[in-house]
């Protein structure tokens, strides 16, 4: 299970270094093989390959009215491997889709990661905090 936030930098070739605390888990769980695709909120999702296979099956089973979402998730997916330095290459198309330039945030979301443009993530987080808790969390005890 992946959790936590990491402020990272894309290099000139679009590579992102996976934090050390997650590399071993990705090697054990997926032999360093991951899949990156678009997220409807404007970020990217990075899945260990076995988790991607489960997600892909769920997406493929969606009804015809979700056909465009199948295209968005499956048609945009890029299979990549961690290199010997623990980096993953984010394709130019995916960097453009998520407006990733240099500074990014990697968020552990349990079974996968989200990759955000750092400024976009900060703005969306501040907006969410300003709106207050959604009804689904009103009775949640902290």
Curated annotation (Swiss-Prot):
GO terms of biological process kind: negative regulation of DNA-templated transcription initiation
GO molecular function: DNA-binding transcription factor activity; transcription cis-regulatory region binding
Any one cellular-component term (Gene Ontology): nucleoid
Main localisation: cytoplasm
Domain SpoVT-AbrB: 5-51, 77-120
Compartment(s) where it occurs, according to its Swiss-Prot or TrEMBL record: Cytoplasm, Nucleoid
KW DNA-binding (keyword) present: yes
InterPro entries (alphabetical): MraZ, MraZ_C, MraZ_dom, MraZ_N, MraZ_sf, SpoVT-AbrB_dom, SpoVT-AbrB_sf
Keywords on record: Cytoplasm, DNA-binding, Repeat, Transcription, Transcription regulation
Subunit structure, interactors included: Forms oligomers.
NCBIfam families assigned: division/cell wall cluster transcriptional repressor MraZ
Family: Belongs to the MraZ family.
This protein's name: Transcriptional regulator MraZ
Organism: Ralstonia nicotianae (strain ATCC BAA-1114 / GMI1000) (Ralstonia solanacearum)
Gene: mraZ
């Amino acid at each position: 299970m992946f959790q936590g936030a990491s402020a990272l930098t894309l290099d000139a070739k679009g590579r992102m270094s996976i934090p050390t605390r997650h590399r071993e888990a990705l090697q054990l769980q997926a032999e360093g093989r991951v899949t990156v695709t678009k997220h409807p909120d404007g970020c990217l999702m990075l899945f260990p390959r076995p988790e991607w296979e489960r997600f892909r099956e769920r997406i493929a089973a969606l009804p015809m009215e979700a056909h465009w979402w199948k295209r968005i998730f499956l048609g945009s997916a890029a299979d990549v491997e961690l290199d010997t330095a623990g980096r993953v290459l984010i394709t130019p198309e995916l960097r453009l889709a998520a407006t990733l330039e240099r500074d990014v945030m990697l968020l552990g979301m349990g079974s996968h990661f989200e990759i955000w443009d750092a400024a976009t993530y900060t703005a969306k987080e501040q907006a969410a905090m300003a709106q207050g808790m959604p009804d689904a969390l009103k009775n949640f005890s902290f």
